[in-house]
A protein has these predicted regions:
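Short intracellular "coupling" helices and adjacent cytoplasmic loop segments at the cytosolic face
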Residues: 2-5, 105, 113-137, 141-143, ...
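An intracellular "coupling" helix at the cytosolic face of ABC transporter transmembrane type-1 domains
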Residues: 23-26, 124-125, 143-150, 154, ...
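Transmembrane helix-loop-helix hairpins at lipid-water interfaces of multipass membrane proteins
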Residues: 28-92, 173-177, 288-292
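Helix-loop-helix
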Residues: 170-184, 254-327, 332-333
Length: 592
């Protein structure tokens, strides 16, 4: 996002947010009732205390004149009554705070759950066009910011507005003239408040954006710190982080600076109100129009009038941050999803594994086609190797087969049915995958292998590990299958990680296998063991193997040679070597 960009739709975002919490409107109504009740009890007290002040001043004057004394009993009753009102006000405030906190946490819980579910339905293109840190920032920072703002802004807004109304009513009962003088400060306060809001709004949005950028950079640097050190890129990373951090600093400073202006401005305006009330009150008291206690109560009301106006200003700033955060979360929730279910889906039961590519055309951007005309027919149980230089489109073909992306033209058929006619989840259950990048999670080795099929028994997990030639090294580890992998998965080697992911794929027992550089991260000895296990595993299953080490796919039934998105050669190893073409050059180059 460009620096200084305003929120796209502040009013619309606030409207969406309040519609989102509509499920809890009964609780919000109760919060409003208790907030207003707390305000009423609080607003009544100054006038009641004014009576005590009047009684005290009259008692002193009578005592000086020798006509009586101070009526402490009457004053004591007033003070006890006020104490009761304040206790009720605090009790009501506690109840509304308790309920509102519960509502806020439920909203945040629901939103996190919906975001988590949404992420599972998002297309691969969404994640490949954004950093992980930026996506995570919306789930953590933005939802937390929204929750904090929601918890404080609703109750404070209700309390502030009801206080202003209540105070003005009570002031009118004392002196309409003094009320008019006091209320004249409100337009000044509102104009100053709107000026500050207008200035700060865009910076709050920018601040939230760059928090996401910071998280993304930190995640990338932390995840790739070995590569950064190996290439001596610490200074470059530091410079890039400094630039992003500098932008965040400036936007945060400006937003907080304008936000901080609110209180001193409102204090200045409030002090003007005090001066005006003191002068007009003194003049009215001299004329005998009002009593001393009324002036004391009125001054309290003036203070109570400026304070909620300040609170409204603070709430507005809070709502700016809340809206900026909520807007980013709603943007994620409103992103286009993958179509998970189709009408009259084809069943995946009894899938044999016949795969046909019919003139497939694809580009990550519609104006940059990388696969121009891909056609191939794979019979059930055949082993298909896809080879070619980097960028030829090998991995892209796998993504299309799994429907991580949909083709721009042509079709991919599974057992004669267009893969778009299957429910996406059921289609992906057909495929077992071992990717270039190993993905394991914090937990035991047994749990990581069982991820391939959650209902598998311990014996089945161990059998899969043996088939992947992982049983020996697992048994030698402290705790064996119950050894806990740490959060960074650094307590086993890269080759061992690869073996575990292969064991997971074996356990899943899918009819079609996809091995994307499955042996590229292991040493030659381990590669031979894995290759023997893979040969046994692939018997009777349609298998797609992507490998740079051409020696590993010599026994493939079909080898598809890709270059610049097209198949330029196909056949088995002997046929392609006899052609003495591009494949032969690739193969010979690895042995030269």
């Amino acid at each position: 996002m460009m620096g200084g960009e305003k929120a796209k739709d502040f009013k619309g975002t606030i409207g969406k947010l309040f519609r989102y919490i509509g499920k809890y409107k009964a609780a919000v109504v109760v919060v409003a009732i208790f907030a207003i009740g707390s305000t009423v009890f609080n607003v009544v007290c100054p006038k009641v205390l004014g009576k005590a002040t009047t009684a005290l001043s009259e008692g002193i004057m009578n005592k000086i004149a020798g006509n009586g004394g101070i009526d402490f009993t009457y004053i004591g009753k007033i003070l006890l009554f006020c104490l009761g009102l304040y206790v009720l006000s605090v009790a009501f405030s506690f109840v509304q705070g308790f309920i509102m906190t519960g509502v806020t946490q439920k909203v945040c819980y629901r939103m996190r759950r919906e975001v988590s579910e949404k992420i599972n339905r998002m297309p691969m293109s969404y994640f490949e066009s954004r950093t992980y840190g930026e996506v995570l920032s919306r789930i953590t920072n933005d939802i937390d910011t929204m929750g904090n703002g929601l918890n404080q802004s609703i109750t404070q807004l209700i309390t502030s507005v009801s206080t202003v109304i209540g105070v003005i009513v009570m002031m009118l009962t004392i002196s309409p003239l003094m009320t008019l003088i006091s209320v004249l400060i409100l337009p000044i306060s509102i104009m100053l408040m709107m000026f500050v809001i207008k200035k700060s709004q865009r910076f709050f949005k920018q601040q939230q954006e760059y928090v996401g950028h910071i998280n993304g950079q930190v995640e990338e640097v932390y995840g790739g710190h070995n590569v950064i050190k190996a290439f001596n890129k610490e200074n470059d990373v530091r410079r890039e982080f400094h630039e992003t951090n500098e932008t965040l600093y400036k936007s945060a400073w400006k937003s907080q600076f304008f936000s901080g202006l609110m209180q001193p401005i409102m204090m200045f305006v409030g002090n003007l109100g005090y001066v005006a009330v003191a002068i007009s009150g003194a003049a009215l008291a001299i004329r005998g129009t009002i009593q001393i206690g009324d002036i004391q109560a009125f001054i309290q009301y003036v203070k109570n009038l400026t304070q909620p106006v300040q609170q409204v200003a603070q709430v507005t700033n809070m709502m700016q941050q809340m809206a900026a955060a909520a807007e980013r979360v709603f943007e994620l929730l409103e992103e286009k999803e993958e179509e998970q279910i189709v009408e009259n889906p084809v069943s995946t039961e009894g899938i044999k594994g016949e795969v046909t590519f019919e003139h497939v055309k694809f580009g990550y951007n519609s104006d940059q086609i990388i696969i121009k005309d891909f056609s191939a027919h794979v019979k059930p149980g055949q082993q298909v190797a896809i080879v070619g230089p980097t960028g030829a489109g090998k991995t892209t073909m796998v993504k299309l087969l799994m429907r991580f992306y949909d083709v721009n033209g042509g079709a991919i058929l599974l057992d004669g049915h267009n893969i778009k006619d299957f429910n996406r989840r059921e289609l992906r259950d057909v495929f077992g995958m071992v990717l270039q990048d190993t993905w394991l999670f914090k937990g035991t080795i047994m749990e990581n292998i069982r991820y391939g099929r959650l209902d598998a028994t311990d014996e089945e997990v161990i059998a899969a590990a043996k088939a992947a030639h992982a049983h020996r090294f697992i048994s030698a580890l402290p705790g064996g299958y119950n050894m806990e992998l740490n959060e960074e998965i650094t307590n086993i080697s890269q080759g061992q990680k690869q073996l575990l992911t292969i064991a997971r794929a074996i356990l899943a027992d899918n009819p079609v296998l996809i091995l994307d550089e499955a042996t590229s991260s292991v040493d030659t000895r381990t590669e031979h063991r894995i290759q023997r296990a893979m040969d046994n595993l692939m018997k009777g299953r349609t298998s797609f193997v992507i490998a740079h080490r051409l020696s590993t796919i010599k026994n493939a039934d079909i080898i598809l040679v890709m270059k610049d998105g097209d198949i330029i050669e196909q056949g088995n190893h002997d046929e392609l070597m006899a052609q003495n073409g591009f494949y032969a050059d690739l193969y010979n180059s690895q042995w030269s």
